[in-house]
Design a protein with these regions (language model features):
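Short, solvent-exposed loop/turn segments at the edges of secondary structure
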Residues: 85-88, 129-132, 140-145, 160-161, ...
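Short beta-strand/turn micro-motifs at beta-sheet edges
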Residues: 78-82, 133-137, 191-197
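PPIase-associated folding chaperone regions across multiple families
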Residues: 21, 158-165, 184
Length: 274
């Protein structure tokens, strides 16, 4: 079965065939339209635009804009395929009960003749330091919500790990984080949580809160900022950080014990140049 799969994938990556182009475009357009009244996506898009005013992280969504979908260039798609679908820009991650010597020979048989190509040079985009608070209002039919976010460092850096730790101190399985204990469980708001995202370049740390009925966004914001102050002042139990670290280790071990988890860890490392 592995050889059949390799044969099919070799054909797929050898030549781009846009036979189903218009059918796929309709599917993408449908997803794009669904996103237009999804307040979670709309808020996220606005947040990313303000955090990254220069970088594609904030200036280019996965689906793009409506004008991109209205006039897609098949020539540009072919050019992108030819530029980036090259062996020195690819990784094949195979996990499972494999005979690795035989597997390597099969991979080499079907993919070994792919030619190395120089990748198009990309200039590193540097964002200016944030010196002031930027506010954006996003209109949607859903309940009010507030997101606060800070730009952080890239995936795998010390700062990204620290941002992940702070997110865990604030939101910990819905039970032991400061937001869990002091806001959610005390019913001071409908819901609140913290999270961090590390990208290949830069990252973000964010807080989200959904206020109760007749509670203003300004009041909800103060609830979040009060918990941030507690983190800054070390006002949380001594056992929390060691517990978070132990849980992170446990989750990592569990992930690596599954084929999907191991494969995801490997290709994630490749994508982020780690």
């Amino acid at each position: 079965e592995l050889e059949k799969w390799l044969k099919i994938e070799k054909e797929r990556f050898s030549d781009l065939v846009l036979r189903l182009f218009h059918t796929e475009l309709e599917s993408v357009y449908e997803e794009f339209n669904r996103a237009q009244d999804n307040d979670g996506r709309l808020v996220h898009y606005a947040l990313m635009e303000e955090l990254f005013p220069k970088h594609p992280n904030g200036q280019q969504t996965t689906l793009g804009k409506s004008e991109h979908l209205k006039n897609p260039s098949m020539k540009a798609i072919h050019q992108y395929f030819n530029d980036f679908y090259v062996p020195n820009n690819m990784a094949m991650v195979l996990v499972g009960d494999l005979d690795f010597e035989e597997t390597i020979l099969l991979v080499d048989e079907y993919f070994g003749k792919f030619e190395y190509k120089e990748l198009p040079k990309k200039e590193k985009i540097i964002e200016e330091p944030q010196t002031e608070i930027v506010e954006r209002i996003v209109k949607s039919p859903s309940a009010p919500r507030l997101n606060i976010a800070w730009r952080t460092d890239s995936y795998g850096t010390k700062e990204e790990h620290l941002a992940e730790m702070v997110a865990q101190i604030l939101s910990n399985s819905g039970e032991a984080g400061l937001l869990d204990l002091n806001i959610n469980q005390k019913h001071k708001a409908l819901r609140s949580y913290a999270y961090e995202l590390g990208f290949k370049q830069y990252g973000l740390f964010s807080l989200m809160i959904i206020p109760k009925e007749n509670q203003s966004l300004e009041e909800a914001e103060q609830l979040l900022l009060a918990e941030i102050e507690k983190v800054k002042n070390g006002d949380f139990p001594d056992w929390l950080i060691p517990a978070i670290i132990n849980d992170m280790k446990l989750q990592k071990i569990r992930n690596l014990e599954t084929a999907d988890g191991l494969a995801t860890a490997l290709y994630g490392t490749f994508i982020n140049n780690q």
